[in-house]
Amino acid sequence: PLMLGEGATQLVKNAAATAEQLDKMCEMFNTMGVTVTFEQENMLNEVIPYAGSAPAYLYAYADAFVQSAKQHGIDEDDALTLICQTMIGSAKMLLRRDKTPAELIRAVCSPGGTTIEGMKVLEDRDLYGIVSEACDKCIKRAYELG
């Protein structure tokens, strides 16, 4: 994402840098996406799964959709085009911040419809727990690596 100017960079405010220097750093990193600053250095470990490692997790999610689409006779390139554009549009909806992720999910899930059936599988398989565990393991490893 950074190579495309769509990354997410994290910086720590500390006594070694002036506010002006921090602003300059943010300005520089903002040319590659967005920058979030934290007060405590340990937050750099805590944020790794949500920015640094997240692309791999999102690629895996996209790949799972592509593999499923192929099983249903959809061309791989077409499937990738569909899921990529859907991810872009969904991310833009989230960035508007006028609805929470839960509200957006409810807006897409018609009672008795197709989407709700798929969501039931994600809930039954504990998607939220799986994501939480992956993030916890990532953070734990970040601390181990120092």
Regions found by a protein language model. Name each.
Residues 81-146:
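NAD(P)-dependent Rossmann-like dehydrogenase/reductase catalytic/cofactor-binding core
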